[in-house]
Amino acid sequence: MLTALQADLASVVEGVNLVWVLTVTFLIFFMHAGFAMLEAGQVRAKNVANQLTKNLLTWSIGVIVFFLLGAAVSAIVAGLTGGPATTVADAFMGLYAPDASATTAWVDWLFGAVFAMTAATIVSGAVAGRARLRAYLTYTILIAGVIYPVVVGVTWAGGFLNGLGFHDFAGGMIVHGMGGIAGLTAAWIIGPRMNRFNADGSANVIPGHSITFAVLGTLILAFGWYGFNVGTAAAPLAYSDGGVTLGSFAYVGRVALVTTLGMAAGALGAGGVAFYKTGKVDTLYVANGVLAGLVGITAIADDIVWPGALVVGLLAGAQLPIVFEFVEKRLRIDDVCAVFPVHGSAGVLGTLLYPVFAVPVWHEGASIVSLAVPQVVGVGVIAVWTFVATTAIFGGFRAIGQVRVSADHERQGLDTAEHGVDTYPEFGSPDADTGIRADGSGIPYGHGFMTTQEDE
């Protein structure tokens, strides 16, 4: 039986843990400001308001859907695939009207919701400049209500991949990998922007309007990532036998360290490969390399040490220019904000490298094969589910001619055509003869990723 002092101490521990979870949750929420700036900087000036509107509505619609439907779907799917058994009624009412004893129910939901909205908003960058808003928002409803919750159900919520031993600490594959694959699939179905590719299949670069915004967005995202990774250590204190010990905080320093080193190595990897290929250090490659390094670390940050973080971050950054060029020149898919090489392939890479750098392999003698098999199966299941679901939704809209805006609206710009606003009104209207504005929104097409060209 707990004494009064012990009971008070237990309450203090729970309170500290809840404050920690809420703090990192708010930090992760602020990552949406980073996504908004990163994507706005990489689109043309005539499409900035459209991109910002999609970011705002992704959160606003998605978080309501995740509350009303998505969280319950996760619990139901988990119960159907080997996780904790639950009824449909309990899955919904456990969130709508939790028991008095379930003091953390809504905090736990909010923590899960910011992860869900991160997965949802990744897609918007891939389809920028031509996606019809109603198609995109319908997909937002379904990714928040069904697609992402199914992935969570078979993994974090206790489903069959969790039972198999699949390891994803903070969403390298569950959040970022699936978001990147969904974005690539959507961009493939919608098709490229006008004049993105020539008749012979060669690519034209349509430069974004503000590297400044893109870099600012990168740094905001990197800051929020500390909430994403470090915050997943969700119970800093533990109470047992009348005493308080460090819970997840026993390893939180290592998570913070490998997160920091991973992002830095990612920037160097992407910048180095870009320099090797073009003779120039592309600013956007460096910025996106920071994010690719972070994505690569996210699935395994709890179970690796600093040498592994440097290698994984470097590889995640280095693959970015290579994969982007493959998507652009071989697949001829117009992934505007490079969401697949930043989130998709980097997330897959980091998740699959877990058995190579995992602490249990080197310190506990675990078998690499025993750790590798669940990772391969998990990546495959998540990738196939995401591809099939995304194809069905955007393919359906394409079949009825509602997946992308009209050619006139795309040419005019979605800010004025779809929203009735001009993001930069002080620059005036495009010149009737050249189509070039003072803000550069009609700038002739260049070469390379965004700014550079390989030497002849």
UniProtKB/Swiss-Prot annotation:
The chain crosses the membrane at residues 18-38, 61-81, 109-129, 141-161, 170-190, 211-231, 255-275, 281-301, 304-324, 339-359, 377-397. Homotrimer. Interacts with both GlnK1 and GlnK2 after ammonium shock. Coiled coil: none annotated. Signal peptide: none annotated. Keywords: Ammonia transport, Cell membrane, Membrane, Transmembrane, Transmembrane helix, Transport. It comes from the Archaea. The record marks H176, H343 as: Twin-His motif. Important for optimum substrate conductance. InterPro entries: Ammonium/urea_transptr (IPR029020), Ammonium_transpt_CS (IPR018047), NH4_transpt_AmtB-like_dom (IPR024041). Involved in the uptake of ammonium/ammonia (NH(4)(+)/NH(3)). Transport is electrogenic. Its main location: membrane. GO terms for biological process: ammonium homeostasis. The gene is amt2. It is found in: Cell membrane. It is a multi-pass membrane protein. Belongs to the ammonia transporter channel (TC 1.A.11.2) family. GO terms for molecular function: ammonium channel activity. PANTHER family: AMMONIUM TRANSPORTER. This is Ammonium transporter Amt2. Induction: Expressed during ammonium starvation under nitrate-rich conditions. GO terms for cellular component: plasma membrane. Pfam families: Ammonium_transp.
